[in-house]
Structure formats: C-alpha cells, structure tokens
C-alpha cells in the first residue's frame, strides 16, 4: 500500500503547519507548552482523555510541561494533523486508526471487518503484544505511538431508509475513511464508498452528496449527524480504535524522564475514556 498526496492536500497541510507553528507561544524559562489536536468536539471522550494527560503532566512537572488541546478540527483534517505531527509542527494528535492504514500497515489488522468480536476482545489484543507492536511501528515514519483508545463498534447510518438485509446497501453512497480496507468492504457489500474526512460528513449529508456513512455511535451523536441521517443500522462491522501519536522529532527532544512520564500518562488516560 502507498500514500498518495494531491498538490492541494500538500499545500493545505503546509498552510496548517505554518498556522500551528504560529500558535506556539514564546516559552519562558524552562517551561514548554505541548500542542495536541483532535477533530472531535470539546467534550468527546478522547479530547477529555488528552486534556487529562495535560493536567497530570503539568502537575507532575510542577508546570514545567503543559499541554493545550485544539479540538473540533481547529487545525484541519486528521490527515493534515498526521502530517503536521510527522514534521514537528504539532506535538500530539488523536486520530482514527483507519486514517493511518495506508501509511502504517500494522494498523490495518485492527480494522479488518468482523475480525474483532467485542470490546473485551479488542482490549485483549491492544493491551497485549499486538498493541505493543502496532505502537512500535509508528517510529519508522516519524511518529511515536502513545496509546490506543477503544472507540466502540462502527455501524452504518443513512438518510434513505432502514437496512434490513445486506442487499439494502446496494447503490448507497456511503462515506468511509480514507482507507483501502473500508473502500473494499463497502464495494464488496454493493455500496458506493466515498472517502471523506470526518469534518466533511455533515455537509455532505446535508447536500445529499452522500446517502450515509459509517462510524461509532459517539461520533454519530457528537457531530449531530443524526439530525440528517435518521436510520441507524447496527452492523458492527468494525471495532477499529483510535490511536494517540506524537511527533517523533518532538518526543525525542524531551528528556528520558519526561518521555517515560508522557508514555505512562498516555497509557493511564485509556481508563479516562
């Protein structure tokens, strides 16, 4: 699998990276402000988990390290945020694992359709050797894996009507993450998959660019997509989780003790979800 970038995406990413750099305040003394991003709203569980990391980090270091969270896609789409982290323009980002599939193939296993049976099954995998190897795999391409968050099962929702059988998916234009796994799955089911970033889904539903999408129930509610797409079908076709990653360059600029502290807090933040 390979990453493909369009000129417009590259230019957008550069612009956002410059904007993120401008957001960094001048640091006085030994203090350092880390930046974290998320496309979800302020009270979404992953945003609260990362905010908790910041609170603990500041307390543990007596204010020497602090963390500011930019939520609601303030610094762009997930793909933009991944690129910004890789190049050190931001420090930490929480992204859906499907957005990482094409660049970090180890993440693919967690999103394979109907492979993971339940939340308990997922936790057994990501809390063990599988999760460790996935987090270790980010270092090869400019990131450090910090934690894996359970985001719940993913199901299909749409504007046209209830899905009672797999045949009801035929011809539906469904938004999917930019992942080959999800494109192939929906094509196999007869749907017409349309890759869009999370922030584009509401307007795409509103303008009928798409008929529906697939996601977890928390994202469905927090983004208020239920106001347009009123038919939720409990397909539970994937338990693909969210992953917290950090810029490798910026991580390595921390002391060994601070690196260990940040890793430990990230792991503890899983329970905050």
Regions found by a protein language model. Give the residues of each.
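N-terminal secretory/targeting leader peptides
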Residues: 2-5, 9-121, 129-130, 136-273
């Amino acid at each position: 699998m390979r990453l493909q970038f369009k000129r417009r995406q590259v230019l957008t990413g550069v612009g956002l990276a410059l904007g993120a750099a401008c957001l960094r305040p001048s640091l006085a003394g030994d203090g350092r402000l880390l930046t974290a991003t998320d496309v979800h709203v302020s009270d979404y569980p992953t945003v609260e988990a990362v905010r908790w990391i910041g609170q603990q980090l500041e307390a543990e270091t007596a204010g020497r390290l602090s963390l500011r969270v930019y939520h609601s896609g303030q610094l762009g789409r997930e793909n933009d945020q991944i690129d910004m982290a890789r190049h050190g323009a931001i420090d930490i980002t929480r992204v859906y694992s499907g957005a990482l599939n094409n660049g970090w193939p180890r993440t693919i296993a967690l999103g394979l359709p109907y492979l993971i049976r339940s939340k308990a099954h997922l936790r057994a995998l990501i809390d063990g050797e599988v999760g460790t190897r996935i987090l270790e795999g980010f270092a090869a391409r400019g990131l450090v894996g910090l934690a894996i968050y359970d985001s719940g099962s993913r199901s299909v929702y749409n504007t046209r009507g209830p899905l009672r059988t797999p045949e009801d998916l035929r011809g539906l234009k469904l938004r999917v993450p930019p992942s080959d796994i999800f494109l192939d799955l929906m094509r196999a089911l007869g749907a017409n998959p349309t890759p869009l970033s999370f922030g584009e889904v509401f307007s795409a539903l509103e303008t009928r660019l798409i008929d529906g999408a697939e996601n977890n129930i928390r994202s469905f509610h927090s983004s208020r997509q239920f106001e347009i797409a009123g038919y939720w079908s409990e397909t539970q076709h994937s338990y693909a989780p969210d992953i917290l990653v950090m810029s490798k360059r910026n991580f390595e600029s921390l002391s060994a003790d601070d690196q260990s502290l940040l890793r430990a807090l990230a792991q503890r933040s899983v329970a905050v979800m």
